[in-house]
Amino acid sequence: MMNPLIIKLGGVLLDSEEALERLFTALVNYRKEHQRPLVIVHGGGCLVDDLMKQLNLPVKKKDGLRVTPADQIDIITGALAGTANKTLLAWAKKHGIASVGLFLGDGDSVSVTPLDEELGHVGQAHPGSPKLINTLLENGFMPVISSIGVTDSGDLMNVNADQAATALAATLGADLILLSDVSGILDGKGQRIAEMTSAKAEQLIAQGIITDGMIVKVHAALDAARTLGRPVDIASWRHAEQLPALFNGVSIGTRILA
């Protein structure tokens, strides 16, 4: 089996039918021509924010990571492992892609430990067992995995989806693409930066050009590139016609080098 490709979905993609249609059309086109197995990892930040608003619950973040109190983890699990995951499975079904919905704890695919007491039920992802996912891939299924995990003591944890995808890529020896709303990392003039190193990233953070959630994303991508020992791509789902090329190794966004 060829080494798998993990596509991490983020941003407003889950909220946009147009975006999902573009993405799944690109997946179908890619699968027609390539044998490479695909795995989708997703969060669902926007979906969770909307749900919190409806329930009048405050959304607190610390260093770009969502604070998840004990009384909110069930709601967030429902949104991510439930609604977001099943929405993606429904789109896969509509496009004739055989898929299976999972969370990080299934088959111990990604192991999770608590990240920081102040963040509550927020987990740090670590490589786990490739057995279940490889079994699914060998049988032609596309796993669709939410970024909810579980600790060894049985506590549900909300995990940053970029970090979850990185841990899974390390588990499977897979390549990784982080798909989001932005076409990559932009410089001070709004131009796409084609390649990014650790030194360049720190410089742009110090200059205030990379801020907030993008800092978390860049650090996750740099960690991923270091952990995996190979480049990681950050790109946008908006350029649907370029996605099959991206899935085939052509950089259309920012390529993060270890």
UniProtKB/Swiss-Prot annotation:
* Family per record: Belongs to the acetylglutamate kinase family. ArgB subfamily.
Q: Where in the cell is it found?
A: Cytoplasm
Q: Name one GO molecular function term.
A: ATP binding
Q: Which InterPro entries match?
A: AceGlu_kinase-like_sf, AcgluKinase_fam, ArgB, Asp/Glu/Uridylate_kinase, NAGK-NC
Per the UniProt entry, the Enzyme Commission number(s) are 2.7.2.8
A single GO BP annotation from the record?
L-arginine biosynthetic process
A Pfam family that the UniProt record links to this protein: AA_kinase
Q: What pathway, per the record?
A: Amino-acid biosynthesis; L-arginine biosynthesis; N(2)-acetyl-L-ornithine from L-glutamate: step 2/4
Subunit details: Homodimer.
Q: Which NCBIfam families match?
A: argB (TIGR00761)
| Species whose genome carries this gene | Cronobacter sakazakii (strain ATCC BAA-894) (Enterobacter sakazakii)
- What is the phylogenetic placement of the source species in the record? Bacteria, Pseudomonadati, Pseudomonadota, Gammaproteobacteria, Enterobacterales
Query: For ATP, which residues are the binding ones?
Result: 181-186, 209-211
Q: Which domain of life is it from?
A: Bacteria
Site (Transition state stabilizer) location in chain = 8, 217
Q: What does this protein do?
A: Catalyzes the ATP-dependent phosphorylation of N-acetyl-L-glutamate.
- The protein's name is Acetylglutamate kinase
Q: Which reaction does it catalyse?
A: N-acetyl-L-glutamate + ATP = N-acetyl-L-glutamyl 5-phosphate + ADP
Residue positions annotated to bind substrate are 44-45, 66, 158
Q: Which keywords are on file for this protein?
A: Amino-acid biosynthesis, Arginine biosynthesis, ATP-binding, Cytoplasm, Kinase, Nucleotide-binding, Transferase
Q: What cellular-component terms does GO give this entry?
A: cytoplasm
